[in-house]
């Protein structure tokens, strides 16, 4: 049966594509150089210090350790930890079994965070809690440290309303008679092996999303770098004037965006093979005697919202990774957001986008069924050729080619819509698991999260039933091979099992697509019957 055979081909192509993509990614990563990193970055580790301050605007809440001024914890107030939780999602965390921090400081010959000193500055603040008020345009949180030689270091965290980017500003006043030379650095470090309580993957679906490091440079707009590469000391050492460094997981990102002070160094490193580090170091910054210098950088801690990330740094929005089919996923996402702005429900937006896509591909679908009908009409002649030249396979092929030419039929014409639909299906899959806007997005009744699997498996069963109806309409009477007929009859069950762990939004798309197929199939076939 042609339709069911097409489903089988679709599944095969889907799995093959994902395996090929994983292989390509691994091959690319293996080409990276294995460079040794300056050991100054290894000393910056967790030290117990009870002195902390708390900073909050309306979307993020930060905990800053006054020893070094690192961001040790960050909660995203607009996102729940889990679907039914009242707690906000904690992106950065410092615990006994898991560390995820955003660190920054001044290193080099005269830097207070330099490994030469084997310590970091212990900053002070005038209070412990800082909250952005309802009518305030920005919140400035200064912390200060005075060195032994009288140099004043002021590190200021600047937050704005409804913004996930935090400006980090160093104000260094040098009252001495000698110049100071230092570098600003920013790095992100994270425990490689996740504890069970911190599972960032969606549902039980086997195709996990990327969790690891990433960067942007003069030569590469966006590159991912696996934690495994860092753990095996296959480290990055890249000189670049532009760019950023980041750590990514499904839906969320932490990124340092350095100020353009010349050529920065992007590096990776491993601490005890269990903690991955990616960071940047600026060129040497000279602070003349009796003068002050302002040194800036920016930190993103939040969801991967494309339109906001694009404003913070060039190419940062590319961390919303739609894979190889980004050129399809991006316009699909834009169309989906337009529909959502009108309808107000992501599920109904998916249904509407399904109708739109199936409407656009209708000419191909019609051509497919016409080709299938012609092929079915030719079956007696094809069978006659096979019986007549049963002992000569080459002659059978030649005669069948001549028959196709005579009848003006392309035997592969029925497969074209499948090749068109597969990229659409894949791009929608990547969009659903990669767009934070769809995280915990409800539809109707029991479907409270379109980005995760149906908790009761109702949608996959409905999808299987729609396949069964397509099978009944198409009929399998023309299939002579008993084994092939059994396989085709069993396809709805196979696909139902295959879709159990798919995001419910994707299963919804396939259900609607199948219903459209049933309607289009009955309409086209009935017209063909009338025109005979």
Curated annotation (Swiss-Prot):
**Can you cite a GO biological process for this protein?**
protein insertion into membrane
- What Pfam families does the database record attribute to this sequence? 60KD_IMP (PF02096), YidC_periplas (PF14849)
| Gene3D superfamilies xrefs | 2.70.98.90
The alphabetical list of record keywords is: Cell membrane, Chaperone, Membrane, Protein transport, Transmembrane, Transmembrane helix, Transport
Per the record, GO CC terms?
plasma membrane
Q: Where are the transmembrane segments?
A: 7-27, 336-356, 413-433, 450-470, 492-512
**By its UniProt entry, which InterPro entries does this protein fall under?**
Membr_insert_YidC (IPR019998), Membr_insert_YidC_N (IPR028053), YidC/ALB3/OXA1/COX18 (IPR001708), YidC/Oxa/ALB_C (IPR028055), YidC_ALB_C (IPR047196), YidC_periplasmic_sf (IPR038221)
How is the protein disposed in the membrane? Answer: Multi-pass membrane protein
Show which residues constitute the signal peptide: none
User: Where can this protein be found?
Assistant: Cell membrane
Top-rank taxon, per record = Bacteria
> Keyword Transport on this protein?
yes
**GO MF terms on file?**
membrane insertase activity
Q: Is Cell membrane tagged as a keyword?
A: yes
Q: Which family does it belong to?
A: Belongs to the OXA1/ALB3/YidC family. Type 1 subfamily.
**What quaternary structure, including any partners, is listed in this protein's UniProt entry?**
Interacts with the Sec translocase complex via SecD. Specifically interacts with transmembrane segments of nascent integral membrane proteins during membrane integration.
Looking up HAMAP family in the UniProt record yields: YidC_type1 (MF_01810)
Describe the function of this protein. Answer: Required for the insertion and/or proper folding and/or complex formation of integral membrane proteins into the membrane. Involved in integration of membrane proteins that insert both dependently and independently of the Sec translocase complex, as well as at least some lipoproteins. Aids folding of multispanning membrane proteins.
| Name recorded for this polypeptide | Membrane protein insertase YidC
* Organism encoding this protein: Buchnera aphidicola subsp. Acyrthosiphon pisum (strain APS)
């Amino acid at each position: 049966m042609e339709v069911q055979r097409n489903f089988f081909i679709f599944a095969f192509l889907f799995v093959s594509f994902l395996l090929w993509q994983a292989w390509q990614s691994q091959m690319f990563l293996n080409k990276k150089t294995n460079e040794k990193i300056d050991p100054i970055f290894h000393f910056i580790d967790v030290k117990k210090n009870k002195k902390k301050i708390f900073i909050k605007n309306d979307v993020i809440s930060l905990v800053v350790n006054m020893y070094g001024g690192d961001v040790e914890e960050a909660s995203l107030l607009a996102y729940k930890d889990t679907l039914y939780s009242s707690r906000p999602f904690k992106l950065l965390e410092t615990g006994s079994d898991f560390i995820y921090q955003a660190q920054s400081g001044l290193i080099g010959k005269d830097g207070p965070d330099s490994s030469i000193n084997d310590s970091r500055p212990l900053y002070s603040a005038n209070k412990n809690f800082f909250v952005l008020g309802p009518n305030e345009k920005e919140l400035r949180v200064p912390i200060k440290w005075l060195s032994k030689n009288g140099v004043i270091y002021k590190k200021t965290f600047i937050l704005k309303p409804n913004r996930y980017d935090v400006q980090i500003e160093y104000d260094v006043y040098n009252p001495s008679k000698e110049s100071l030379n230092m570098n600003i650095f920013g790095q992100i470090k994270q425990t490689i092996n996740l504890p069970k309580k911190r599972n960032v993957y969606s549902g039980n679906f086997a195709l996990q999303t990327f969790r690891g490091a990433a960067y942007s440079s003069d030569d590469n707009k966006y590159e991912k770098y696996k934690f495994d590469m860092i753990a095996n000391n296959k480290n990055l050492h890249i000189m670049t004037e532009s760019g950023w460094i980041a750590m990514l997981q499904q839906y969320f990102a932490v990124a340092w965006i350095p100020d353009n002070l010349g050529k920065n160094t992007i590096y990776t490193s491993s601490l005890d093979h269990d903690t991955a580090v990616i960071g940047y170091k600026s060129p040497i910054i000279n602070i003349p005697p009796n003068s002050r210098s302002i040194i800036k950088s920016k930190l993103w801690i939040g969801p991967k919202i494309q339109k906001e990330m694009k404003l913070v740094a060039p190419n940062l929005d590319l961390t919303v990774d739609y894979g190889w089919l980004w050129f399809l996923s991006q316009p699909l996402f834009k169309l989906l957001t337009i529909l959502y702005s009108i309808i107000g429900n992501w599920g109904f937006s998916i249904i509407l986008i399904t109708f739109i896509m199936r409407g656009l591909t209708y000419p191909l679908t019609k051509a497919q069924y016409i080709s299938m009908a012609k092929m079915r009409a030719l079956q007696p002649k094809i069978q006659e050729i096979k019986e007549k030249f049963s002992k000569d396979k080459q002659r059978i092929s030649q005669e069948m080619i001549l028959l196709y030419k005579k009848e003006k039929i392309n035997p592969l014409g029925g497969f074209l819509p499948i090749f068109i639909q597969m990229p659409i299906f894949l791009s929608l899959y990547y969009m659903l698991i990669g767009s934070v806007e769809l995280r915990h997005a409800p539809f109707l009744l029991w479907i409270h999260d379109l980005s995760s699997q149906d908790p009761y498996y109702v949608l996959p069963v409905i999808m299987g039933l729609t396949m069964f109806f397509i099978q009944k309409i198409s009929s399998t009477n023309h299939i002579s091979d008993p084994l092939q007929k059994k396989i085709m009859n069993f396809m709805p069950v196979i696909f139902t099992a295959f879709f159990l762990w798919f995001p419910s939004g994707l299963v919804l798309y396939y259900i609607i697509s199948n219903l459209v197929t049933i309607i289009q199939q009955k309409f086209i076939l009935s017209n063909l019957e009338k025109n005979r």
